Design a protein with these regions (language model features):
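Intrinsic disorder/low-complexity segments enriched in polar/small residues
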Residues: 41, 45, 70-72
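Short, cationic-aromatic polyanion-contact patches
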Residues: 3-14, 28, 58-75
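Basic amphipathic alpha-helical segments that dock to polyanions
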Residues: 49-50
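Residue-level "edge-of-site" marker
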Residues: 45-46, 63
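Short amphipathic alpha-helical interface segments
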Residues: 10-38, 45
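Glycine-centered, phosphate/nucleic-acid-interacting loop/turn motifs that mediate DNA/RNA or nucleotide
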Residues: 54
């Protein structure tokens, strides 16, 4: 799936998570949840799907960021 197709199929909540992640290169689950005004469980579910699709990655300290491939539209 290409980046445009992934974005087209995202829910409003997932788009909100992606938007916040663009402005915060390394963000914790709690910070992301608070910024998006979503429950931590919902945010974690969305972020894990993003990890599976190669949109996001989890860093060594439990912080999340968008992958360079996704940011550059290579996926």
């Amino acid at each position: 799936m290409h980046a445009k197709e992934i974005r087209r199929n995202m829910t409003e909540e997932a788009l909100s998570v992606e938007f916040v992640m663009r402005g915060h290169p390394r963000i914790s689950l709690a910070e992301l949840s608070e910024a998006c005004r979503l429950s931590q469980a919902s945010t974690e579910f969305i972020i894990e799907q993003m990890v599976c699709f190669g949109v996001a990655r989890r860093g060594a300290f439990g912080r999340y960021s968008l992958t360079k491939e996704y940011e550059n539209g290579i996926i």
